[in-house]
Each structure stands twice: as structure tokens, then as C-alpha cells.
Amino acid sequence: MVVQNVQDLDVLPKHSSDSFDDDGRPKRTGTVWTASAHIITAVIGSGVLSLAWAVAQIGWIGGPVAMLLFSFVTFYTSTLLCSCYRSGDSVTGKRNYTYMDAIHSNLGGIKVKVCGVVQYVNLFGTAIGYTIASAISLVAIQRTSCQQMNGPNDPCHVNGNVYMIAFGIVQIIFSQIPDFDQLWWLSIVAAVMSFAYSAIGLGLGVSKVVENKEIKGSLTGVTVGTVTLSGTVTSSQKIWRTFQSLGNIAFAYSYSMILIEIQDTVKSPPAEVNTMRKATFVSVAVTTVFYMLCGCVGYAAFGDNAPGNLLAHGGFRNPYWLLDIANLAIVIHLVGAYQVYCQPLFAFVEKEASRRFPESEFVTKEIKIQLFPGKPFNLNLFRLVWRTFFVMTTTLISMLMPFFNDVVGLLGAIGFWPLTVYFPVEMYIAQKNVPRWGTKWVCLQVLSVTCLFVSVAAAAGSVIGIVSDLKVYKPFQSEF
């Protein structure tokens, strides 16, 4: 008699229908490709722009090895996390709609609150990082126009505050989209844009290497005493920059905190866990190839002077029109990525508000507005006020602290170990009843502890960088 594991059966869960899923919610429509688009939109973001700088800090050996290791860890722990979307049976078990729901079902207790704080602080910080990155790209577009008129030697300093405000206004509008599932089209557009500017950066890097007639860089990266764009590198700076570069690479692979929310958009059959494993493999494989190419080619082109933002910090100067297209693509991508990251935070706050104030019309009432022919738009006053306040806050903080590389490194360090490694590992151990002190348990714990040390080191390097920047920075005078 052949016994087949129920996890391998692509069956439709009970109590589902043509219009609704087994949990009574509207039928989910996500596929491998839409899930991959969501992930790629989240992963290939502004982090790719700092990879050449990160590789420059640790060299031709450390750079590629670090990217490969981070990609492996991210893929492996993401497959563990995929298994936690449903509690119990992976096909018919109770759904966990958010990352925190999965923590609550599998771990419970104080870990739920700790996870919530880390996850939502990281999402909040990512919104700040994306606002800064968008302003840098818009400033770069204005700078190329200025240098076309005044010559390439004109520094053309531009205040980025107006662009941060403009980006914030756009986000206020898009943030009124009620649900994550309705963002599929924005994610696809953003994913296409991410490929576009990554490809342009890669092409410009290759052309720069050909122009130089040499491959720059060294096996161990920037050496003590080297004069870079930001000054002479001291021994302590070498250490802190090495740690910060690990944070930048970790941030480039950061998406675990929204993986469960993405999985909740996927239809079944086939089982959601199978779809997400495929989507995770496709996404991580594609992004790793892009990261290796962009980071290594950028380092080969500029060596120790690789800029913090490959397309906007003066690394390339020609052709102007292509640089403008690349930076515009970055901005369009960041509009979508901002929403992909913030929707889980929006949903959490609105769910809590509805639970605490179920009788309040301000919180719960949906006002139907017919903007265009067809389906009316649902306007919720609490959603309007809260999401607008959130965007305004992230914009204000971005104007106060526009340190792209340091912020990116700190975000990567804060989020990588707890969200990408620790909680997925602990949930998997709890759900699968992995025996304590068994071989698998020990291997998982070694992985977790190793990543903890990496995160602490990366956070320290980024904090030192922010402190150094604050010594010379004047608030609301963000010139790039």
C-alpha cells in the first residue's frame, strides 16, 4: 500500500467555492509569477545601488562570497517560513495572514510582541530609506541637466528636500489603495523598472571597465591609508566599513518580513507552500545574479572609489539621457516598493483600530466614491488620516537624516537576524517538532547564532557611520 504525504497533494481546501476561499475571504488569484514580482519588487530595490561600495570594502574575495552566503541563508530560511503560512497541515490548516500571525500560532508569548516591534520598525525604516533613495535619484536627474548647461566640472549641489516632499505626496495617494492584493499591477511595473535600472547600471559598468582597460580593485578591498571620495581610510574606518558593508548586503536581501503577506495573495491549488517555494527560488536566483553582476562590475569599474549610490553619486557622467532614464526607473520602482513594504504595517494598525473601536464609524465605515466608470472606490476616513500621517512622518525623518548608506546598513542589520533567520528557524522547529540537540536542531542553531554575530557587527558599523555624519550635518539642508 502506497501512502502519499498530504503535503504533496495539490488539493483544494475544504469549504472553498468559486468566489471564496476556505477562510471565507474573496478568492485569491496570485501565482508563482505574481508572487515572484512582489518579491523582486521588494528585494531588487535601492539596496542594489550600494553593492559596488559594499564589495569595495571587502574586496574580490569577501564581496562575492558574502553575497552568495546571504542569498543561500535568505533562500533557506524563506523556505522554512513558507511552511508556517498554515498552522498544522500545510494544505488545509488554519491560515496565518501576517508574519505576526505566524509567530503567534507557532511560538506565542513575548516573542509575538518582540517580532511585531522589530518587523514594523524595520518596515518603517525601509520607508525612510526608500524616500531618501528616491530623492537622491531625482536630484541626480536635475544635476545632469545642470551639468549639461554649466559643464561637467560644476558640482551643481541640489537640495533634496523638495523631492522628498514630492515623493511623499505621491505615496499619500498610492497609500489609499486598501489591500495588498490590489497592488499586483504596481508590483509588476516596479519589478520591470528594477530590472531596467539594474541593467543600465550593469551596462555602464561594463563600458567603464572597457574604457579603463583594466579591472580595478583588490582581493581584500579598501586598504588603510587609501584616499577615497570621503577621505583617507583609517584602520578603525576599515573595520567599521567592513561591518557596514555586510549590513548593506543583508538589506539587499531583505524581504522575509513581508513573505507571509505575499503568500496570502497566492491561490490554491496548488498548495500555497509549493507556489511560494518556487517563487522564492526564482526570485532569489534572479536577484543574486543581478547583485553579483552589479556589485562586481561596479567595483571593477571604480575600485576603491566605488560610490555609495552607483547611479546617482557621480560614478557615471555619460550618457546623460541614459542616466536620467535609469534614475527615473529607480524612482518608479521605489514608489511601488514603498507600498509593498508599508501595506503590512498599514493593515496591522487598521486591524487593531477596528478591534479596539468596532462601533466607531470613523474607523470602520467605508464610503463608496464613484471616481471612474465601474467599481466604486472605498474611502475610509481612518485609513485616509492614518496613512497620510505615516507618509508625512517618514518624509520628515528622511529630511532630518538623509544618510543613504548608513541607513541602509542599519536597516539590514536590524532586520536580518531576527526576521530572516531567528523567527523562521524557531517557528520551523516548533511546527515540525525538531528534537532538541538533534543534528538538525544543532545545525539550525549554529546558523542562527552565526547570523546574530554578523547582524551585531553590521549594526555597530552603521551606527558609527551615522554618528560621524551627524557631526557635520545640518537638519533640513540635505544637499546631494
From Swiss-Prot:
Cytoplasmic side: 1-31, 74-120, 179-182, 263-280, 350-383, 428-445
UniProt-listed GO biological process terms: basic amino acid transport
Phenotype when the gene is knocked out: No visible phenotype, but decreased uptake of L-arginine and L-lysine.
Regulation of its activity: Inhibited by 2,4-dinitrophenol.
GO molecular function: amino acid transmembrane transporter activity; basic amino acid transmembrane transporter activity; symporter activity
Expression by tissue: Expressed in leaves, stems, roots, siliques and flowers.
Function field: Amino acid-proton symporter. Stereospecific transporter with a broad specificity for glutamate and both neutral and basic amino acids. Reduced affinities for asparagine and valine. High affinity transport of the cationic amino acids arginine and lysine, but not of histidine.
Protein name: Amino acid permease 5
Gene that encodes it: AAP5
